[in-house]
């Protein structure tokens, strides 16, 4: 049990999730302690601002029923650390790292600071090995790479929760004898969503290789800020100490940013764009930059954060700043979802900056780059022709243009669309890609190398298409 270094009874104000302590000396930023109200119940606190003679601390257990008068604050001279262990795999925790599954925590193997240990940029290795998610739109076009941070930009009402559960269930590292684990972090999610994830992980067996950190919307806002860091701290321990390849799935980072804005408002800070704090970019970077690979270490940390864009606005500060930090984005389309296509990816708006270095011969298959480049280019042209057809009518188009319309329909219905419980390997994804590309004339596939087209093009499919 920790011995308090100093105690204060000078709580000046309780404001939302924050308390202000006066006449402080020697209290450090990030230091943890506890506040004890008149009822004698201790609540964990963490210092988030230090002045000349005062300190502001966030109460991780919430301030409901906590008065300023009669409360005592004790500080321990230490930063916030959580117990970590390999035996956390298979467990469900809350946003503070405490059990949510009504079972005791396993014996700790170590205690780790939730803020992590930054990787020396010189020691980072460039990500070059793929992660197979089993989802064709990701694996085929925008491959997720070990050590990458690749977010999903979604919108209210779109199936990002289904996608998160599917990725947790299906993701794997192929051809590797090294261990693979998933850390799932739910940030500010509703009880209904938490029950869905817990039931889904248990029912499908995904929990056997996963750690779930669930912070509910009804939990204190300070815990919402802590939850992603708890999940990443567990993931970093599994990766850097035990050699696991860890995929960290975080949903919903919009809830995190809303919590950040609430805390900033409570501290009386000058707001930035749309009321969010001016340091939100830096704060998000402290989360996203914890992904990567390190020279001399076997493991890796890959991040797959999900955020909902308010009003589907990709220029909103949350997706805007996220895009500056991460290495691409996967954008979900409301129009595709309206067509009944799952997962409803917006192929043209999506991007993975590292995918080109993690695909090809020896990694996925020799034709992977050719398929991805050709599919995207052909679909982009097909969308232009589809718009033209709405003006002049399909009957007035040439036979090549009509081929592109058939290709676009097949691409959406056969390549992009797949079942929630359907898992496709890289080979299956690429084979479907060639099936839909073969609707087009062979001389239209200019983004593929001639020798690759000659080897994989399905001429019998081209000849069987009815116009």
From Swiss-Prot:
It comes from the Archaea. Residues 95-114 are annotated as: Disordered. The keyword Transport applies. GO terms for cellular component: plasma membrane. This is A-type ATP synthase subunit B. It is a peripheral membrane protein. InterPro entries: ATP-synt_VA_C, ATPase_F1/V1/A1_a/bsu_N, ATPase_F1/V1/A1_a/bsu_nucl-bd, P-loop_NTPase, V-ATPase_su_B/beta. GO terms for molecular function: ATP binding; proton-transporting ATP synthase activity, rotational mechanism; proton-transporting ATPase activity, rotational mechanism. SUPFAM superfamilies: P-loop containing nucleoside triphosphate hydrolases. Belongs to the ATPase alpha/beta chains family. It comes from Pyrobaculum aerophilum (strain ATCC 51768 / DSM 7523 / JCM 9630 / CIP 104966 / NBRC 100827 / IM2). PANTHER family: V-TYPE PROTON ATPASE SUBUNIT B (PTHR43389:SF4). It holds the Pfam family ATP-synt_ab_N. Component of the A-type ATP synthase that produces ATP from ADP in the presence of a proton gradient across the membrane. The B chain is a regulatory subunit. It is found in: Cell membrane.
């Amino acid at each position: 049990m920790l011995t308090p270094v100093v105690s204060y009874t000078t709580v000046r104000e309780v404001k939302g999730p924050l308390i202000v302590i006066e006449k402080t000396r020697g209290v450090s930023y990030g230091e943890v302690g506890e506040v004890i109200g008149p009822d004698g119940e201790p609540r964990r606190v963490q210092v988030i601002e230090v002045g000349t003679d005062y300190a502001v601390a966030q109460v991780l257990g919430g301030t409901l029923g906590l008065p300023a008068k009669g409360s005592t604050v004790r500080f321990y001279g230490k930063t916030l650390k959580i117990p970590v262990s390999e035996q956390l795999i298979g467990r469900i925790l809350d946003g503070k790292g405490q059990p949510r599954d009504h079972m005791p925590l396993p014996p700790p193997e170590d205690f780790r600071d939730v803020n992590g240990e930054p990787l020396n940029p010189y020691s980072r290795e460039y990500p070059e090995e793929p992660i197979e998610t089993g989802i064709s739109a990701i694996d085929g076009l925008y491959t997720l790479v070990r050590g990458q941070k690749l977010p999903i930009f979604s919108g209210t009402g779109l199936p990002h929760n289904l996608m998160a559960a599917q990725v947790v269930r299906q993701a794997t590292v192929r051809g590797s004898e090294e261990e693979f684990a998933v850390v799932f972090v739910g940030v500010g999610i509703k009880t209904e969503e938490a029950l869905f994830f817990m039931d889904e992980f248990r029912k499908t067996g995904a929990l056997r290789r996963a750690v779930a950190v669930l912070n509910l919307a009804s939990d204190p806002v300070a815990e919402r800020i802590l939850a992603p860091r708890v999940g990443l701290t567990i993931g970093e321990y599994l990766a850097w100490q035990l050699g696991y390849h860890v995929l960290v799935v975080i949903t919903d980072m919009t809830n995190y940013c809303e919590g950040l804005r609430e805390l900033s408002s409570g501290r009386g800070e000058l707001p930035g764009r749309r009321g969010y704090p001016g340091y939100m970019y830096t704060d998000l970077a402290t989360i996203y930059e914890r992904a990567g690979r390190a020279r001399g270490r076997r493991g890796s940390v890959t991040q797959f954060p999900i955020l909902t864009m308010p009003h589907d606005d990709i220029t909103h500060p949350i997706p805007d700043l996220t895009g500056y930090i991460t290495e691409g984005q996967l954008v979900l389309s409301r129009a595709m979802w309206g067509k009944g296509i799952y997962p409803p990816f917006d192929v043209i708006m999506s991007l993975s900056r590292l995918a080109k270095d993690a695909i090809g011969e020896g990694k996925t298959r020799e034709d992977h780059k050719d398929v991805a480049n050709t599919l995207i280019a052909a679909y982009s042209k097909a969308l232009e022709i589809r718009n033209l057809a709405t003006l002049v009518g399909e009957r007035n188009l040439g036979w090549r243009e009509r081929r592109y319309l058939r290709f676009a329909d097949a691409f959406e219905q056969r390549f992009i669309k797949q079942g929630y419980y359907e898992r496709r390997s890289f080979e299956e994804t690429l084979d479907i890609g060639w099936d839909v590309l073969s609707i087009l004339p062979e001389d239209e596939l200019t983004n593929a190398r001639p020798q690759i087209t000659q080897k994989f093009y399905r001429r019998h499919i081209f000849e069987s298409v009815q116009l």
